[in-house]
Regions:
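Short, surface-exposed "cap/lid" segments of acyl-processing enzymes
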Residues: 8-63
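Accessory cap/linker subdomain of secreted extracellular hydrolases
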Residues: 153-253
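Short beta-strand/loop motif that positions the catalytic acidic residue
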Residues: 262-264, 268
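Short alpha-helix in the alpha/beta-hydrolase fold that links the catalytic acid
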Residues: 272-282
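Catalytic histidine neighborhood in serine/cysteine hydrolases
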Residues: 284-302
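Conserved small/polar residues in nucleotide/adenosyl-binding loops
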Residues: 327-334
Length: 334
């Protein structure tokens, strides 16, 4: 938790922004709290391989603090603690952010009804959006004012297809490891499909940060990891237990109880613009208050992740301004 020295110049109590971090990895050393000075660190993983942990959003934490907002950053379940990080498990990510909000407000001796918002991009966007969905049922005492979610992976099977063969294809191993830890049926259904190289893929994922993954497993086609030569997406389609596990995490099924800004670049090469737009439309159809932004971005080399990463730095400042406006005035007018 970061407590600002700058005064809050808006109305009422100092607000709090809970950040869901973007993909850091699955190894314990990848946790946001493990980054040196909360910025980044280089070292060795549990298995002795070089590893790097970078806080992509650090400048945005500072931006929020300069505005006088309190900042809380959640490690998410399994990062820096026993067990696999349950990557893109939206239900657990929602609980992690909401619990972090509760704990942070208590630690700061802030009123339980102090204004609160969520922010994140990519994995963090999904975590923030899921927290917005579950706030009313899981933490109704919290005064959630709004959420900013950039490039959230709202449809996991669709995201799997676009990630496969990309620079960050190893993150599929993070997801499989996490879901396998929660469901023996899922674990058995998946593991019987992998060849020895596929098993190495999963074992390596368990101790890797995302930079390590790009260097060691970047652009891996999952057809090279399975016994049958099928892609993971093809296996998902023929194995109901796997598909149902992933579909259970899809977002857009329940309306957030506060305004949400969603942003996605039409050129995003990892998390499709269409899935984010569809989810925004689903919320609108349920009566949600949604601002959807077709974010500016780049169109460079497909599947490298560049066109996914650039909008983070273009749109997060807009999202933070949106949250600060929600704290101080009528969001619809602003």
């Amino acid at each position: 938790m970061y407590e600002p020295t700058a005064p809050w110049r808006g109305k009422g109590e100092r607000p709090t922004i809970v950040f869901g971090p973007s993909t850091r990895g699955q190894g314990d050393q990848c946790a946001p709290s493990r980054a040196g000075m909360q910025v980044g660190s280089v070292g060795l993983s549990k298995v002795g391989s070089p590893t790097i942990n970078v806080s992509y959003e650090y400048s945005f934490y500072m931006m929020a603090l300069r505005r006088g907002a309190r900042v809380i950053v959640a490690d998410l379940i399994g990062l820096g603690m026993p067990g696999h990080h349950t990557y893109v498990n939206h239900i657990e990510e929602a609980h992690a952010l909401l619990d972090a909000a509760r704990s942070g407000l208590s630690l700061a001796h802030a009123p339980a009804d102090a204004p609160l918002g969520f922010a994140g991009y990519s994995q963090g966007g999904g975590a923030s959006l899921s927290a917005a969905e579950y706030a009313e049922s899981y933490a109704p005492e919290l005064n959630v004012v709004g959420t900013y979610a950039g490039a959230p992976p709202t449809d996991l099977p669709e995201t799997m297809r676009s990630i496969d063969g990309s620079a960050i294809s190893h993150v599929l191993g993070y997801a499989i490891n996490g879901f396998a830890e929660r469901s023996p049926e899922f674990r058995d259904a998946v593991l019987e499909e992998f060849n020895p190289r596929g098993i190495d893929f999963l074992r390596s994922a368990a101790t890797s940060c995302v930079g390590d993954s790009v260097l060691t497993w970047g652009f891996t086609d999952t057809r090279r990891l399975t016994r049958t030569g099928e892609s993971l997406s093809e296996i998902v389609e023929r194995k109901p237990v796997i598909k149902e596990t992933l579909m259970r995490q899809n977002l857009g099924k329940q309306v957030p109880n506060a305004p949400v800004m969603m942003a996605s670049s039409p050129h995003d090469d990892l998390i499709s613009h269409d899935q984010v737009r569809r989810t925004a439309g689903a919320y609108c159809s349920m009566g949600g208050t949604i601002d959807f932004i077709a974010a500016p971005g780049t169109s460079t080399i497909p599947r490298t992740g560049v066109d996914h990463a650039v909008p983070l730095y273009l749109e997060m400042p807009v999202g933070l301004r949106y949250l600060c406006l929600l704290y101080t005035s009528d969001a619809a007018d602003e």
